[in-house]
Design a protein with these regions (language model features):
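Charged, glycine-rich active-site and insertion segments that engage polyanionic ligands
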Residues: 1-49, 55-58, 65-66, 162-165, ...
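Clamp-loader machinery-focused feature within the broader ASCE/P-loop NTPase space
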Residues: 2-148
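Conserved catalytic/switch belt of AAA+ P-loop NTPases
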Residues: 126, 151-165
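Short N-terminal helix/helix-N-cap motif within the alpha/beta-hydrolase-1
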Residues: 147-150, 334
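Residues immediately C-terminal
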Residues: 144-145, 159, 175
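Conserved adenine-binding aromatic site and its adjacent loop/helix in ATP-hydrolyzing domains
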Residues: 123, 155, 182
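Loop/turn-to-beta-strand initiation segments
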Residues: 131-136, 161-167
Length: 337
């Protein structure tokens, strides 16, 4: 399914974290935690507050020239390092050279943080700020830097020129170089309770009849559940998937990209494995799942899906890959003891 380029309103469980971080010292912070908890949103609100001309204890004022320029993606003292695909999805402007290369079809937008962007960021920190209190560099997701890119920013991260502050935002902090982690203070986001997460989803326009199912589908990650709703996914569609896949109906998954299909099948496989050993499923209610597949077949299917995940971002033929994945799933789910 297509992904929305919009962003949800900051969730209420981020407010205490924002207030805590605003009262802390330090020029480099690592905001970590699983995806879908709001790391990107929290980091942007923290950057907004640091740059705000009239901040309060709760954060940015939201209406000064600095806040407005962040809304317009034009703040001269804020630099984002992100994969170009995510920069475009979130409506952040690319460097002029990178935009030209993409427009002229010289290359596709990068899914990693490019070393050229890191070098531009280092140069950005060495220029005079435009008139505010700080310069801010936000890196998201920080684990999308390879070793060369990470080493490019290392010295600047350790000894930033002037009053530059860094926000490294990660959904897989264990993948970061230890030398990066050691130069940052860390704040780890905690999981919100289900009740406020559901209330927030409904406040963001998710149908009450869909909210619980989509929150479960997202593994309890509220922003991921919101993104599912934004893509058009309904509870009824999600609940019908496992048995449709067991029947070999590739049509049920044709709206997803190959990478998304693999992720959905991994969730079905996980929950079927849980049922097979007498445990509770996580992503689907038990009645929605096919039963009877032997654990050995499910375990082999899980291994096959891990292998498929390595090529799902760049399949040779998306249609053929979908057919193969569904055929593989049908075979595992209909296997006999």
């Amino acid at each position: 399914m297509s992904e929305s380029t919009a962003s949800p309103a900051p969730a209420p469980w981020l407010a205490p974290a924002l207030k805590t971080l605003l009262n802390q010292r330090g020029h480099a912070w690592l905001l970590s935690g699983p995806s879908g908890l709001g790391q990107y949103t929290l980091a942007l609100e923290l950057a907004r507050a640091w740059l705000c001309l009239q901040p309060s204890e709760e954060g940015a004022c939201g209406h000064c020239a600095s806040c407005r320029s962040i809304d317009l993606r034009t703040h001269a003292d804020l630099r984002l390092l992100m994969p170009e695909t995510q920069m475009l999805d979130k409506a952040w402007p690319l460097h002029e050279k990178a935009q030209k290369e993409i427009d002229e079809k010289d290359r596709k937008p990068s899914r990693e943080i490019r070393v050229d962007a890191a070098r531009d960021m280092v140069a950005f920190t060495q220029t005079t700020r435009s008139g505010g209190r700080h310069k801010v560099v936000m890196i998201y997701p920080a684990e999308r830097m390879n070793h060369i890119t990470a080493n490019t920013i290392l010295k600047t991260l350790e000894e930033p020129p002037g009053d530059t502050r860094f926000l490294l935002v990660s959904e897989a902090a264990h993948l970061l170089l230890p030398t990066l982690r050691s130069r940052c203070q860390t704040h780890t986001l905690s999981w919100p309770d289900a009740a406020p997460a559901l209330q927030w989803l409904v406040s963001q326009g998710v149908a009450p009849t869909d909210a619980q199912v989509l929150l479960d589908a997202a593994g309890g990650r509220p922003e991921d559940a919101w993104a599912m709703a934004q893509s058009g996914l309904k509870a009824s569609t999600w609940l019908a998937l496992p048995k449709a896949v067991a029947r070999g109906e590739a049509l049920a998954l044709q709206a997803w990209t190959p990478a998304q299909v693999v992720a959905v099948l991994q969730k079905i496989c996980h929950d079927c494995q849980m049922l097979a050993v007498g445990a509770a499923p996580r992503f689907f209610p038990a009645p929605a799942l096919p039963v009877g597949a032997p654990l050995a077949a499910l375990t082999q299917w899980s291994k096959d899906l891990l292998s498929s995940a390595r090529t799902a971002e760049h399949p040779f033929n998306a249609g053929l890959m979908l057919e193969a994945l569904v055929s593989q799933a049908r075979g595992a789910l209909r296997a006999k003891h």
